[in-house]
Amino acid sequence: MAPGGNRGWLLRLVIAFSFAQGAVSMARPAVSYRALALGADERAVGVIAGVYALLPLFAAVPLGRRTDHGRCAPLLPAGVALISGGCALSGLAGSLGAMAVWSGVMGLGHLCFVIGAQSLVARQSAPHEQDRNFGHFTIGASLGQLVGPIAAGALIGGADRAHSSALALLVAGAGCAVALSSLWRIESRTAAGSRKAPGDRVPVRRILRARGVPAGIFVSLSVLSATDILTAYLPVVGEHRGIAPSVIGVLLSLRAAATIACRLVLTPLLRLLGRTALLTVTCLLGALLCAGIALPAPVWALAAMLTALGFCLGVGQPLSMTTVVQAAPDGARSTALALRLTGNRLGQVAAPASAGLVAGVAGVAAPFVMLGALLLVSAGTALRSPARPSGETEDGGPRQGPEAVLRRKSGI
C-alpha cells in the first residue's frame, strides 16, 4: 500500500486500538484496587505498576528490528492475545507476586500491539500526513482511556473490592479480544517488500545520535509517565481522600476526553504555534497542573485540573512519534519507534517505583510533584528539539522543492 493512499486501514486500526487500550486502561486501576484488597501498600502498588513495563523493556528493540525487515501486522493479534490473557489471569491471581507476573504479560502484549501499529502508520503515511495520522491513531488510545476507567469504576465498588476488581479484569480481557475483528488484512502483503535486508540494519547508536530522536524519546517518556502514574495513583489518592472509585473513574475519563479533544484540533494548533512551541508550552502547563493535583483540592477543582492536564498531555505522544520517525535513518524507523517505546517503558518502570518510594516517605500526593518536575525538564528538552524535520514546514505540511520530493519518495 503506497503512503498517502486510502485510509480505511487507519480507521480500522483506530477501532482496534480503542478496544486494546480500553482493556489496558480498565485493567490498570483494577489491578491497583485488587492489589490494595490483597493487602498491598503504596510501595507494592508502585512495584506492580512497574512490572507492567519490565518485560517490554527488553523486548522493544528486537521487535522493532523484526518489523523494520518484515511485516507489521502479525504483531497486532499477538499483542491482543497477550493483553487479553494478562488481564484475565490477573483477575484470577490470588497473590501479589502472581499479579505482578500477569501485569508484565499485559505490558508485553501492549508493546507488541503498539510497535506493530505505530510502524504501520509510519510505513503507510506520507511524510506530510504523519502528524495528522499519528494524531488520529492516538485518538484510539484516548478513546480507550476514556471508556476503560469508567467501566472499571462502574464494576469496582462495595465492600468486596477483591471480587469486584477481579470481575473488572475478566471483563477487560474479554473486551480486548474484540479488537481482533478489525485486524483482518490491515496491511498489504506487498508493503514489506521494500524493507531492507537484515544485514543492512542501522546501529542503535547511530539512531540515538540522530538529531531529534533523543528529544522525542524524552518528551514521550515524560508524558507517558505522567499518564501512567495518574492511572495507577489516582485510585490511591481517592482512597486517602474518601473519593469513590466511580468518581475516580469519571475523573480519569475526563482527562482522556480532553486528550481526544486536543488531538482533534492538533493540526490547527500546529499551524498556529508550530511543533516546538506547542510541545514546550503544553509540557510546561502540564508540569504546573501535575503539581496542582498534589494539593488537597475539592473534587470539582481536581476535575478541572485533570481536564486541562489531559489536553496538555494529548500533544506529546503523536508529535514525539512524528519527530522520531522523521529524524530516524531510512530503514530504521520501526527500530527508532521501538527505542522510543523502550524509553517509555524505562519511564514506566522507574516512575511508578520512584512514585511508590516518594509516596511512602512524603505521602500519596507527592508523586504528582515529581511528575511536575519531570514535565518541566521535558519542556526544556522540547525547546531544544529541531524546529522542523527535513522535508516539511513548521506546520507539518510538505516543503516544496527537490528535497521534499526526495523525502516523499523514500517510502515511510
Identify what each model region corresponds to.
Residues 59-71, 262-274:
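Helix-to-loop junctions at the C-terminal end of transmembrane segments
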